[in-house]
Amino acid sequence: MAHGRQQDELQDITLLGNQDNTYNFDYRPDVLESFDNKHQGRDYFVKFNCPEFTSLCPITGQPDFATIYISYIPNVKMVESKSLKLYLFSFRNHGDFHEDCMNIIMNDLIELMDPHYIEVWGKFTPRGGISIDPYTNYGRPNSKYEKMAEHRLMNHDLYPEKIDNR
């Protein structure tokens, strides 16, 4: 029989259930929190669908909107979802290109969790008639996950969807 988590396992989780949250409008990677993966002997994906991502164009200051898909195979640590929400919200006034934002997010999550594998895919709404969909991934070096990352990168968008102004 599976048992729930004990209080001592949750002591580093401070945002979930906290009604007194601060919503930062400037980039804040320090808001990310993690917890232990209780299923380390098994490979499995965790996927976050984040349809309300916003950042700013570094040149014009105009807002950019995207749905971000974050998928990872955890190792020892996992990201806590409310902290991820607040972290993504902190990009609201962050001025960077779409490609930079996706790589920053992936790098911050790698630093937090040290996952076996992670991918971050941003599907931005069109501006000027062009949508940009940066995809970035990482697999632990010298492991099957490194090979997996290479394979997924080469095959990630073989059947692109019809763009219908999202």
From Swiss-Prot:
Assigned EC number: 1.7.1.13
Pathway(s) where this gene product acts: tRNA modification; tRNA-queuosine biosynthesis
Pfam families (UniProt xref): QueF (PF14489)
Single annotated GO MF: preQ1 synthase activity
InterPro entries for this protein: GTP-CH-I_C/QueF, NADPH_dep_7-cyano-7-deazaG_red, QueF, QueF_type1
Binding-site residues for substrate, renumbered to this chain: V79, E80, S81, H98, E99
Function, in words: Catalyzes the NADPH-dependent reduction of 7-cyano-7-deazaguanine (preQ0) to 7-aminomethyl-7-deazaguanine (preQ1).
Name listed for the protein in its UniProt record: NADPH-dependent 7-cyano-7-deazaguanine reductase
GO biological process, one term: tRNA modification
GO cellular component: cytosol
Family membership noted in the UniProt record: Belongs to the GTP cyclohydrolase I family. QueF type 1 subfamily.
